[in-house]
Design a protein with these regions (language model features):
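Short, conserved, GDST-rich strand-edge loop motifs in beta-rich repeat architectures
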Residues: 1, 70-99, 149-162
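Beta-propeller blade signature
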Residues: 1, 40-45, 96-108, 162-173
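Blade-loop segments of beta-propeller domains
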Residues: 1-32
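Hydrophobic beta-strand positions that form the internal "hydrophobic ladder"
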Residues: 26-27, 67, 147
Length: 179
């Protein structure tokens, strides 16, 4: 049975639809609301939206206290089929923005902050021919204390990606690169 429709989807990852970790009749999915991507918490039993969050979710913590997000428009531009194409990417001219990267969303307060910036990730990539940096495949650990992600970059005139697996720890606030 259809319960909603959304334009915030892609053929690789859909709308990031997932079950709520505790509420059996609740699902989360990404959507578009005016000029921004959002996440919605939907109650299937009552057929209604319970909450709308300030950004689309890439992954949600096991205790449902926080979510992680990224710039889905940038992801779509740099890796078509993985992001969302409804809204334009405002970072087109920026190789590694300071104010873009992985975002932390406090689910209870519906507040968002940058956690890992593309500029910080790019700072230890020394190749002068770098064209663009981006992030994909964020995955929160089962205990919610860490998450892993791919930091990806391209070089000018080269269609191949450079990728490294990174792990962020909430315990020390550091990113470790696992190459």
């Amino acid at each position: 049975t259809r319960f909603a429709s959304t334009q915030a989807w892609c053929w690789q990852q859909g709308a990031r639809l997932k079950w709520h970790p505790f509420e059996k009749d609740y699902v989360l999915y990404n959507d578009v609301d005016k000029n921004s991507y959002v996440a919605r918490l939907y109650n299937l039993a009552e057929n209604r939206t319970v909450s709308t969050y300030c950004d689309a979710f890439y992954d949600v913590s096991p205790d449902f206290s926080y979510a992680l997000s990224l710039n889905f428009s940038r992801l779509q531009r740099l890796r078509p089929g993985y992001g969302y194409s409804v809204l334009p990417d405002k970072t087109v001219k920026d190789v590694a923005p300071n104010d873009d990267g992985i975002f932390y969303i406090d689910i209870h307060n519906n507040e968002k902050k940058i956690l890992v910036s593309l500029a910080d990730l790019a700072s230890d990539v020394s190749d002068p021919n770098v064209d663009q940096h981006y992030i994909n495949h964020i995955s929160i650990s089962p205990d919610g204390k860490r998450f892993m992600f791919f930091h990806i970059w391209t070089l000018k005139g080269d269609s191949h990606w450079r990728t490294r697996l990174c792990v962020y720890s909430f315990v020390d606030g550091k990113v470790d690169v696992l190459e």
